[in-house]
Amino acid sequence: IAETRYSQKNEEGKPVEKVKDIFWRVAINVARGDLNFGKTETEVERLAKDFYQLMAEQKFLPNTPCLVNAGRSRQQLSACFVLPIEDSMESILETMSNMAMIHKSGGGTGFSFSSLRPSGDYIKSSGGTTVGPVSFMQAYNDVTAQIKQGGVRRGANMGMLNVYHPDVLRFAVVKLDEWSLTNFNISLAVTNEFMKRVDEDKKFVTDDSIPEEAVEEIRQAEAIRGVDDRLREVEKGVKKLYDWAEAKQVGEGYELINPRTNQVTMKLNAYKVFNLVTRLAWQFGDPGLVFIDRMNEPSSNPVPAVGRIEATNPCGEQPLLPYDACNLGSVNLAKLVIKNPLSSV
């Protein structure tokens, strides 16, 4: 598998490296980086041998881009990046282009779509209305589908949306069918204030069930052939969800805010939203929940003056600032256990 996925290949596409060649290429390339920090050639050689031994003994392996690109002209060794998106067509397309180049080099990408105006919102330049963040996510997904990461694997993305965005429920159900956003993990960014509101809004709810009919209506829409007809059916189900979750009593609900105008569009019962999202995650695997305030505490974001964390890498374990990259690796704990000859374990 290693030779097939990570080896350099000839013009016929056949591997020209054995596993040990891959490990030496990576070890030497990574170790030579220390020449920039005062290490001698002798020290670098020793470091390369140590790194090779870790990989050869299967105690540690770096991420795929490192295995594929180290020692080559590309030199893109990072696993994942977070790219910012602003509310303009220029920014949306520029970020899409950057995403494609990162995927081409073997990296994954994470995005927050929270700054994009909601579906149906006004576009001054054309006098029309926007399709909203979910539709742009599908465009990103389609581009991803055409590019293998480093020519090795399918691209991967994380798409996040703030829970205060007017398209929050439309976003929550976007992966109910098997064909939408197949190259995305999706997560809602929830705040401490929202979680408090979940507890407070529970008293307004007498029935914990979610509108199964609306959820099933959205799921079944994938069988409709025509794109326009399918989208109309999805919107019917989404509208039912908004009607169900809308806050109708005094003191109930939290505000959805249009990011373009900063105006309130409606109020939803936070307990119902939370209940729906957790039910969908349990039953279908998406969306996830990201506790965005926790990620911006000093222990998680040590450089708050640089910016606020709004997204993570595709798998969600690494919060990143805009244009940040993460370099991942796998430690084989079983190989690192020190066996006690006096123990039966």
What function would you assign to each model-found segment?
Residues 1-345:
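Extended catalytic cores of very large enzyme megasubunits
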